[in-house]
Amino acid sequence: VEAAHLKTDIMSVFDDLTQDDQDSFRFLAVEGCAALGKLLEPQDCLAHILPVIVNFSQDKSWRVRYMVANQLYELCEAVGPDSTKTELVPAYVRLLRDNVAEVRIAAAGKVSKFSRILSPELAIQHILPCVKELSTDSSQHVRSALASVIMGMAPVLGKDATIEQLLPIFLSLLKDEFPDVRLNIISKLDQVNQVIGIDLLSQSLLPAIVELAEDRHWRVRLAIIEYIPLLASQLGVGFFDDKLGALIMQWLKDKEYSIRNAAANNVKRLAAEEFGPEWAMQHIIPQVLDMINDPHYLYRMTILHAISLLAPVLGSEITSTNLLPLVVNASKDRVPNIKFNVAKVLQSLIPIVDESVVESTIRPCLVELSEDPDVDVRFFASQALQSSDQVKMSS
């Protein structure tokens, strides 16, 4: 677009749209602000675009204000840092305190992005007070939007301001009555770890994490489980065993399948990536030995799943000596579901243990299961025997 044409024709149309009585046109004009701002010279942008943005941030239609809140970061890029500080910070603060929840939701979702283009001092002076207000907003969706991005403010504010001012807000949001708020904070905890350090993390956030491990909403418990390996790598094995080790076994007995499954995968990750096979032998296997005899068959199934995941990590010798006897013993279980899962686990162990162990222990157990009264048990046992034959032939 030629500059002369842009200034005369397009800007004329744009000016008409910004003053239109229908809010749908003004709504669309907001997007035009960001696009035009990138095309115009800086002085023209300040003269034509900035006043429009400021006016739109106070528009009588909440839909227009919502659009400004949604596009604000792009609008800041268009008008440059100096104008952002003098003109758009007050506009953004108004949007964060808007009387319509939808506008506050859009504005809250931008706090970290907006703070990144400010100095820490400006962010602390102008944005942080609004963040404190939003953390107790009457709308759960506003709090949820804030929780999904607030962690990103930690690197902007630095360690001291994060500890003194952001951390109390994190902790209050971690205890929010609305599960999505708690969930959004948990999923971004790693961003604050890097700023405040592990010592403070263990003092301040760990009690909240332990509490959330028993949260009534399974998705919150699941989010905590998924955060555990990262936490483990930062806490170290001693601290982890002391503070969080008990949670691992607790999750293996959760009433939700998704939690039990994630917990089993967690055990594998901790053994494979964080603490090693010796840790698993000392801290996990003894408790697995106890749980394989749990009265509830679903928990016994979870342990079988955990064994199948741990075996490749622990290797042939430990699997043959410590895990395989548990699996063979479980083949005598009264529940068909346990027995056909035993057949599946035995099949997964065939490539891990020595061939002599397959012949002396695994095959006899599978042969017995292949004659079980239950059709599913027979099917999976036969499949495992075929797999054993194929491994034998290929070797």
Curated annotation (Swiss-Prot):
Q: How does it assemble?
A: PP2A exists in several trimeric forms, all of which consist of a core composed of a catalytic subunit associated with a 65 kDa regulatory subunit (PR65) (subunit A). The core complex associates with a third, variable subunit (subunit B), which confers distinct properties to the holoenzyme.
The name under which this protein is listed is: Protein phosphatase PP2A regulatory subunit A
PROSITE patterns cross-referenced by the UniProt entry: HEAT_REPEAT
What the entry lists under InterPro entries is as follows: ARM-like, ARM-type_fold, HEAT, HEAT_type_2, PP2A/SF3B1-like_HEAT, PP2A_Regulatory_Subunit_A
Naming one, the record's GO cellular component terms include: protein phosphatase type 2A complex
Q: Which SUPFAM superfamilies match?
A: ARM repeat
Which keywords appear in this protein's UniProt record, sorted alphabetically?
Repeat
Repeat among the record's keywords?
A: yes
HEAT repeat positions in this chain? Answer: 44-81, 83-120, 122-159, 161-198, 200-237, 239-276, 279-316, 318-355
For this UniProt entry, the molecular function terms from Gene Ontology, in alphabetical order, are:
protein phosphatase regulator activity
Q: Could you name the domain of life of the organism this protein comes from?
A: Eukaryota
Concerning Pfam families, the annotation shows: HEAT, PPP2R1A-like_HEAT
Protein role: The PR65 subunit of protein phosphatase 2A serves as a scaffolding molecule to coordinate the assembly of the catalytic subunit and a variable regulatory B subunit.
The keyword ATP-binding is annotated on this UniProt entry: no
Which family does the record claim for this protein?
Belongs to the phosphatase 2A regulatory subunit A family.
